Design a protein with these regions (language model features):
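Structural beta-alpha unit
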Residues: 1-4, 18, 28, 76-114, ...
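Small/aliphatic-rich secondary-structure junction motif
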Residues: 2-59, 157-220
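Gly/Ser-rich helix-loop-strand patches that form or flank binding pockets
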Residues: 4-6, 28-32, 103-156
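Short glycine-rich, flexible loops that bind phosphorylated cofactors or substrates
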Residues: 17, 122-123, 167, 234
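Short glycine/serine/threonine/alanine-rich loop segments
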Residues: 35-36, 86, 111, 142, ...
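A short acidic, glycine-rich active-site loop
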Residues: 58-72, 216-226
């Protein structure tokens, strides 16, 4: 069963210059899924917020100025997307931490998909993800797409990673949801859909006793595991995938 994406939320980072790479992916999805698109940005300045708590008129004016400045940036971005034939609305929020503001907007608007861009390669040691990204990956209530490459012309292959044997106590229906999301993206982009299940080789583990069994480690042979996994996947694949 495919999962519809009617509302796509693109969370932009105010400090990023130029055309955010997440916009390329969002534009493609909006065009091919017929989804409603919303660009959002979160702005916040601690000193301004403190001044507002004290009732300072200057701080309130500064807050309005920051929000309006970011709104103008989003409006310009939305206008450029309109030239591509995609309509996008804009939303600027004030708050901290950014992940909480984004999560609140997802719930308020009822977003079906969150699109977020990573940092440029080399801008952060060892990773292209910020703390905001990690927190959203942990708590986002809807599917989340992390875009990393601005040179984007569509998805050639969509990979759905599932665990039919449920060795890690996944939530009920998680694999079905993954298959539905992957099928939706693959169909919309006319790409190949691959479903994969990766499991440890029993021969790779030398267990001293039956007590020393870790999550994901099991007793069994590769042939039966592969057959069980393949049967589960094929029985739940969308009929037209």
């Amino acid at each position: 069963m495919r999962q519809p994406f009617n509302k796509v939320l693109v969370a932009l980072k105010p400090w990023q210059g130029g055309l955010p790479l997440s916009v390329y992916h969002a534009r493609f999805l909006a065009e091919n899924l017929g989804a409603q698109l919303r660009l959002m940005s979160c702005v916040y300045e601690p000193e301004v917020s403190l001044g507002m708590l004290k009732g300072e008129a200057e701080a309130l004016a500064a807050q309005v100025g920051l929000v309006e400045s970011e709104r103008a940036v989003l409006a310009e971005l939305a206008a450029s997307m309109k030239d591509w034939g995609v309509e996008a609305e804009c939303k600027v929020c004030w708050g901290h931490p950014a992940e909480d503001v984004i999560l609140a907007e997802i719930e308020r608007w009822g977003a079906d998909l969150l699109v977020l861009g990573t940092h440029q390669a080399g801008s952060r040691p060892h990773t292209r993800l910020a703390q905001v990204d990690w927190q959203l990956m942990r708590s986002c209530p809807c599917p989340m797409l992390l875009a990393r490459d601005p040179q984007f012309e569509g998805y050639r292959t969509v990979l759905a990673a599932v665990d039919p044997l449920h060795r890690h106590a996944e939530p009920e229906g998680l694999d079905r949801s993954i298959l539905g999301i992957a099928s939706t993206l693959a169909t919309a982009s006319a790409s190949n859909l691959l479903v994969g299940h990766v499991y440890p080789d029993p021969e790779s583990f030398a267990l001293a006793s039956s007590v020393e069994v870790l999550p994901g480690v099991f007793y069994g042979d590769r042939k039966s595991t592969r057959l069980n996994s393949s049967h589960w996947i094929t029985s739940r694949m969308p009929s037209s995938a």
